[in-house]
UniProtKB/Swiss-Prot annotation:
Keywords: Cytoplasm, Cytoplasmic vesicle, Endoplasmic reticulum, ER-Golgi transport, Golgi apparatus, Membrane, Metal-binding, Protein transport, Transport, Zinc. This is Protein transport protein SEC23-1. It is found in: Cytoplasm; Cytoplasmic vesicle, COPII-coated vesicle membrane; Endoplasmic reticulum membrane; Golgi apparatus membrane. It is a peripheral membrane protein.
């Protein structure tokens, strides 16, 4: 089966492209029925139609007209593929013919440009930590200034700065730069805050009235109106004046600043498109939201501290930021969190702020690095029509025919609990209990793992030519950056087959399945012990092989997997070793960052993160992919490693010696110079569109940064097993892929089928 075609046309990839016909059979398949879906995938030739979709009037349905619906031109009616209700066709569909078929009856993915108006342009509230060093702050100010040119002219912008206190800047006066100052150690509530800023008590919701000197929305004004004053204030920012005592950290009120930002937007722009863009240069040292004590003698928590219950502030801080995340999500807003320091800032505690709202989490060493500067500006990337690719206020619904129920979703979203949908499963995977989710923001790369359950407990006979299909429809309503409301609709049909049908096994997409299992594992790792998650992965792999491998009992050498299953075990091997599950040598903030990126990317990029790609360059042959194995490291080759998070060029021992000798500068050795350039050119291509920008590492045999390559390799030759002369020895206690496969085969063949 060509799984890539479905992804190219519809942005969807299923683990199983043919479904079992009963719940029991589905459970025996081990890998859940699920798919990876990219709502705003950039589809070549996507049709955008300039009218509203036709919606089914069936009770609790609201599915949209699609190519799988039955059309009856005689009665001018259509039958919904999801609920089978008959609906009246609007008058514009009454003259259907082979030459006059609407796009939505031809294409399985269609985008509607609806007539619903957008009341308020997008809002960008910049929240800037000023406790950082002057050079770091200056670099940040330059990046923010550069980003203003990428925003729509009518965008509303605001500014909050914070250190020990929180400062809310007021640009409503043309001549005076005003600022409201709040205590950094106070947990403000909505009503008192509104009264403080407007002089009036809050009665119900505040309408988006005209801006006045006393209205709450005076803190958000059009970019085209205040850009000059905004930049003036930005440029005048200096390091926080509160002195830092020796042996102490700066006083930093991140929690209070975020709280005030969220309340301010809630007060005047609830359920309108808004981003809170936070730039932090260290951990919160003031309650509410305190991450670490003021005294430097008390180090910030590690994974070991969290696991052993010694992270004294961790649970309280996480509870505070989770509450903030729920409120911001409910208000329809987004949080982006950018870190620019060597220290941790508390991303582990604050991660739900971005994960529940569709925001960006970025970990960098400084605001002056290329990784921050380019990644931050790529957030505002534009399409060919010069509109920002980011979208706002998204609502994602999954409709399914009676054969299926929705178990849940794993990705950057929040559940809509109040729903009349009837296709919700009793069992939950990820964010469940609903078939509708919200995202304050959507980017084209945002991809969601959606899981399904077979509704029928008993077997449904599927025989003869009467092919039974299960239908799924993904509906994404969102605000486009052009100022329009759009609806992206994708409808797919999957065949149902009885237990034991060879079509089910043939329909297995091992790449999509590996990513779906990985998403579940990462989701489990948030609440379960690491070894328990590893055991779950191992049990899943063993059960799948027991079900679909060919073997003779008690004979490991007879073990065989079909081609579309053969790579799945090695994906699981590299998943077990990945930084998503193996947190040794990573800080909690790094783990939060890695997991955040992993749970938003598509199948291809996710696989690169699980099992990085390795390309070999040599004088004797063309560049070629090689095994991610210590045996691939040779003295006369250059290796290019792509882990998604960093791209590394490794020069073998001989190549490194030639380079140091300067052979590339001698015209006689033009071929060698070309060899050195080849991996750089390929690396540059990988860097062009990736978000966030990966770290680039250039190293050689014996170099200190060669460890970044060696840590990713399968240790075919370790200090425990030094068989191959001339091979690179990897100093690790990790089991090799070969031994892992032997253990797997033994576990499978020694267990009763």
């Amino acid at each position: 089966m060509d799984f890539d075609t479905n992804e190219d046309l519809n942005g969807v990839r299923f683990a199983w492209n043919v479904f079992p016909s009963s719940k029991t059979d589905a459970m025996q398949n081990v890998v859940p029925l699920g798919c990876m879906y990219t709502p705003l995938k950039e589809i070549e030739g996507l049709n955008v139609v300039d009218y509203n979709p036709v919606v089914c009037a069936g009770p609790h349905c609201k599915a949209i007209l699609n190519p799988y619906c039955m059309i009856d031109p005689r009665s001018n009616s259509w039958t919904c593929s999801i609920c089978k209700s008959r609906n009246h066709l609007p008058t514009q569909y009454h003259n259907l013919s082979q030459e006059n078929i609407p796009i939505e009856l031809q294409q399985t993915t269609v985008e509607y440009l609806t007539t619903k108006p957008v009341q308020v342009p997008p809002i960008f509230l910049f929240v800037v930590d000023i406790t950082t060093e002057p050079d770091n702050l200056q670099a940040l100010k330059e990046s923010i200034t550069a980003s203003l040119s990428l925003l729509p002219a009518n965008a509303l912008i605001g500014l909050i700065t914070y250190g020990k206190v929180v400062q809310l800047h007021d640009f409503s006066n043309d001549t005076i730069a005003r600022c409201n100052v709040f205590k950094g150690d106070k947990d403000y509530q909505l009503e008192p805050l509104v009264e403080m800023l407007t002089g009036q008590k809050m009665t119900g919701s505040i309408p988006n009235t005209q801006v006045t000197p006393f209205s709450l929305n005076r803190f958000f004004l059009p970019l085209e109106q205040i850009e000059f004053r905004f930049i003036q204030v930005l440029e005048s920012l200096s390091q926080d004046e509160w002195s830092v005592k020796p042996g102490e950290r700066p006083l930093r009120a991140t929690g209070s600043a975020l709280n005030i930002a969220s309340l301010l937007l809630q007060g005047c722009y609830k359920n309108n498109a808004a981003r809170i863009i936070v730039f932090s240069s260290g951990p919160d040292t003031i309650n509410p939201g305190l991450i670490v004590d003021l005294e430097l003698k008390n180090p910030i928590r590690s994974h070991h501290d969290i696991d052993s219950g010694n992270a004294v502030h961790y649970k309280k801080a996480m509870k505070y930021y989770n509450t903030l995340a729920d409120r911001i999500s409910e208000n329809g807003h987004t949080v982006d969190l950018f870190s620019g320091c060597y220290d941790q800032i508390g991303m582990s505690e604050m991660r739900k702020l971005t994960d529940r709202t569709g925001g960006v989490l970025l970990l960098t060493d400084s605001f002056s690095t290329a990784i921050f500067k380019q990644s931050y500006l790529r957030l505002f990337a534009k399409d060919e029509d010069d509109y920002m690719k980011m979208s706002f206020s998204a609502k994602f619904q999954v409709k399914s025919s009676k054969e299926l129920k929705v178990q849940g979703l794993i990705g950057h979203a929040s559940a809509v609990k109040k729903t009349s949908a009837t296709n919700i499963s009793d069992t939950t995977i990820g964010i469940g209990g609903t078939s509708t989710w919200t995202m304050g923001s959507l980017l084209p790369q945002h991809t969601y793992a959606v899981f399904f359950d077979i509704a029928s407990n008993g077997p449904t006979p599927v025989t003869g030519d009467n092919q039974q299909l299960a239908y799924i429809q993904f509906i994404t309503n969102y605000q486009h950056s052009s100022g329009t409301i759009r609806t992206r609709v994708t409808t797919v049909a999957n065949q149902l087959q009885s237990f034991g049908s060879p079509l089910i096994a043939a329909s297995f997409d091992q790449e999509a399945a590996a990513v779906l299992i990985s998403r579940i594992a990462v989701h489990k790792a948030e609440t379960e012990e690491g070894p328990d998650v590893i055991k779950w992965i191992d049990r899943t792999l063993i059960k799948l092989c027991q079900k679909y491998a060919d073997y003779n009992k008690n004979d490991p050498s007879s073990f065989r997997l079909a081609g579309n299953f053969s790579l799945f075990p090695q994906f699981m091997y590299y998943l077990r070793r990945s930084q998503f599950l193996s947190v040794f040598n990573n800080s909690p903030d790094e783990t939060a960052f890695y997991r955040h990126i992993f749970t938003r990317e598509d199948t291809t990029n996710s696989l690169i993160m699980i099992q990085p790609t390795l390309t070999s360059f040599s004088m004797e042959s063309e560049p070629e992919p090689v095994l991610l194995d210590s045996l691939s490291v040779k003295a006369d080759t250059i290796l290019l490693l792509d882990t998604f998070f960093y791209i590394l060029i490794y020069h073998g021992e001989t190549i490194a010696q030639w380079r140091k000798a300067g052979y590339q500068d001698d015209p006689q050795y033009a071929d060698f110079k070309e060899l050195l350039e080849e991996p750089k050119l390929e690396a540059a291509e990988l860097l062009v569109d990736r978000f966030p920008l990966p770290r680039f590492i250039d190293t050689e045999a014996g170099g200190s940064q060669a460890r970044f390559l060696l840590s990713k390799l399968n240790p075919s030759d370790s200090y425990q097993n030094m068989n191959s002369a001339g091979a690179t020895i990897v100093l690790t206690d990790d089991i090799s892929l070969q031994n892992f496969m032997l253990h797997l085969q033994q576990s499978v063949v020694n267990t009763q089928k």
